[in-house]
């Protein structure tokens, strides 16, 4: 199985040329290559806590290393594994009692340790192979994982930043935010040092009701982060689906429960292909996805290089009792 993993990663690397400090724009070729690997047939949908999920995490870790990122402080590896609680759902999925999920975490040191840390994240798992049907999860959430990878590449290539930036891709989100919850309680840095967490979820297609190129941010009114990033040029707007409770349904919530200012950015969150076998690379809008990721580069760079610390507004502050 290790040979299989290394072969997959080596094939994926073949699509890339060396990164120079001048190459700091989001690259559609990189976006497509990441998507094609993560949501390709070989990984069978990256089912939560499966070997395919572990291969996806190893791929992300290898990319982090190639960008010049380091393992997080105190870690000797880019990978973190977490136990998966036994539930009726894990039994139905046939997961073993000792199943574990895998997070991939990379760290870009800043020049001012006192300035805090910016956390950029996504979940890398999906539904996987369900009774012989493969749910590839190209939009949910190979697209968010790809966004993290491209931002990591661009931000690392553009030189040093004042703040350290941590990039995390979590496992087992589909089983109930398991990877991110474990990360939140076993973080490599004090959570009080995390200035903000921006999570990416389903950025592979535009919502037809938004202005061209716009994205939504969950919990927009819960902190000053969204309005400030929008003022800096981020094409984000408030979540138009409050009844769906998207703020509580993605990995940002695990960090928000720990007191971190944390939000998720999405494209078409109610897309009809969600959790269907039609969520494939063929249905990804690569032009939109590339523009969407690029639209966050300048605002995130500003956040990484400045002194602004977003504050919670007290609007719907989460409690430790999960929905």
Give residue spans per PLM region:
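Alpha-helical metal-binding/catalytic segments enriched in His/Glu/Asp
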Residues: 104-106, 120-176, 296
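His/Asp/Glu-rich mid-to-C-terminal helical/loop segments that flank catalytic regions of hydrolases
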Residues: 272-323
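A non-catalytic alpha/beta surface segment that caps or lines the substrate-entry region
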Residues: 46-107
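N-terminal capping segment at the start of a domain
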Residues: 25-55, 67-73, 79, 125-126, ...
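Second-shell loop/turn segments in exported
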Residues: 22-24, 41-51, 91-95, 132-141, ...
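Bacterial N-terminal signal peptides
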Residues: 6-18
């Amino acid at each position: 199985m290790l040979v299989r993993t290394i072969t997959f990663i080596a094939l994926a690397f073949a699509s890339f040329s060396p990164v120079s400090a001048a190459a700091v724009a989001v690259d559609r070729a990189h976006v497509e290559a990441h998507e094609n690997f993560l949501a390709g047939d070989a990984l069978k949908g990256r089912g939560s806590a499966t070997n395919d999920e572990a291969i996806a995490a190893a791929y992300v870790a290898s990319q982090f290393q190639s960008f010049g990122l380091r393992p997080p402080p105190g870690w000797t590896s880019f990978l973190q594994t977490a136990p998966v609680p036994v539930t009726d759902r894990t039994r139905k999925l046939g997961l073993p009692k000792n199943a574990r999920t895998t997070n991939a975490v990379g760290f870009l040191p800043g020049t001012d340790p006192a300035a805090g840390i910016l956390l950029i994240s996504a979940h890398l798992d999906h539904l996987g192979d369900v009774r012989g049907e493969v749910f590839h999860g190209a939009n949910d959430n190979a697209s968010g994982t790809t966004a993290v990878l491209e931002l990591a590449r661009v931000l690392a290539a553009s030189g040093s930043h004042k703040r350290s930036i941590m990039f995390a891709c979590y496992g087992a989100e589909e089983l109930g935010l398991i990877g991110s919850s474990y990360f939140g309680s076993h973080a490599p840095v004090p959570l009080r040092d995390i200035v903000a967490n921006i999570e990416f979820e389903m950025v592979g297609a535009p919502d037809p009701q938004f202005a061209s190129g716009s994205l939504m941010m969950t919990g927009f009114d819960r902190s000053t982060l969204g309005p400030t990033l929008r003022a800096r040029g981020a094409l984000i707007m408030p979540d138009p689906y409050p009844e769906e409770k998207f703020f509580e349904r993605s990995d940002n919530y695990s960090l928000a429960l720990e007191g971190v200012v944390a939000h998720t950015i999405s494209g078409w969150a109610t897309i009809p292909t969600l959790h269907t076998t039609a969520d494939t690379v063929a249905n990804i809008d690569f032009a939109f996805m590339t523009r969407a990721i690029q639209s966050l580069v300048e605002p995130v760079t500003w956040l990484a290089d400045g002194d602004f610390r977003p504050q919670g507004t007290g609007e719907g502050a989460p409690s430790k009792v999960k929905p």
